[in-house]
Amino acid sequence: MKKVLFYVLPFAFFGCSATVDPQISMKPPAYVEELAPKQSNNVESAPGSLFGKGDNPLFSDKKAMNVNDLVTVVIQESTTQSTQANKATSRTNTSNLGGGALTGSSGVVANALNKVNAYSNIGFQTNSSNNYTGTGSQSRNESFNTTISTRVIKILSNGNYFIEGSRELLINGEKQIIQLSGVIRPYDIGQDNTIDSKYIADAKILYKTEGEVDRSTRKPWGSKVIEAIWPF
């Protein structure tokens, strides 16, 4: 029994390590942490002024301008993929090896030996061929559309915003989780304080579900282990 476990356990561990689901880290990019935050210019308003500086100046747009301000992100992501591969190989090999039973000498003796060799020639011939043909194709279309409110976490020294937001929904026992982070330019924010996801640099978008539907569509771990270690 111990010998069986000794041979089986390594394959089981390998299978478990090879069946880990893809993960995405929502940690900010390194440069976001390295860049110093933009220094705010706090200018005191003149006494009695009607147009003093504040969080919402009179003639400013109602857009995110400061840390902790909200920005609505319109997520419109679609991917289209189509691949096709063909491979064909062929190899033929023929080998001949032969030799006379008698060799050497010259003149009359050589002629006599050649006649003997013509009737007593020994040798062998091999023929081998190998053919392989493979064809594969794949097509995939996916789209994901939703909106999510994010918060300005940091204003970088160049004026760009690092935003982050999440949303969780629980509907009939099925939990939906949406997380988003990335870097945006304030100039790309629309007049209605929204921005399209295509303008987000280093965007990380996570969407996952937890519940009965997710468990029913997930492969059992035993099947994943067998598929990972099965060599054929």
UniProtKB/Swiss-Prot annotation:
UniProt keywords, alphabetically: Bacterial flagellum, Cell outer membrane, Lipoprotein, Membrane, Palmitate, Signal
Membrane topology qualifier: Lipid-anchor
Record GO terms (molecular function): cytoskeletal motor activity
InterPro entries reported for this sequence: Flag_Lring (IPR000527)
Gene Ontology cellular component terms for the protein in this record: bacterial-type flagellum basal body, distal rod, L ring; cell outer membrane
Pfam family, one: FlgH
GO biological process, one term: bacterial-type flagellum-dependent cell motility
PROSITE patterns noted in UniProt: PROKAR_LIPOPROTEIN
Superkingdom of origin: Bacteria
Signal peptide extent: 1-15
Lipid tethering residues (S-diacylglycerol cysteine): 16
Residues with lipidation of kind N-palmitoyl cysteine: 16
Subcellular location: Cell outer membrane; Bacterial flagellum basal body
Chief location of this protein within or outside the cell: membrane
NCBIfam families noted in UniProt: PRK00249.1-3 (NF001303)
Annotated function: Assembles around the rod to form the L-ring and probably protects the motor/basal body from shearing forces during rotation.
Known partners and oligomeric status: The basal body constitutes a major portion of the flagellar organelle and consists of four rings (L,P,S, and M) mounted on a central rod.
Membership in a protein family: Belongs to the FlgH family.
Protein's name in the database: Flagellar L-ring protein
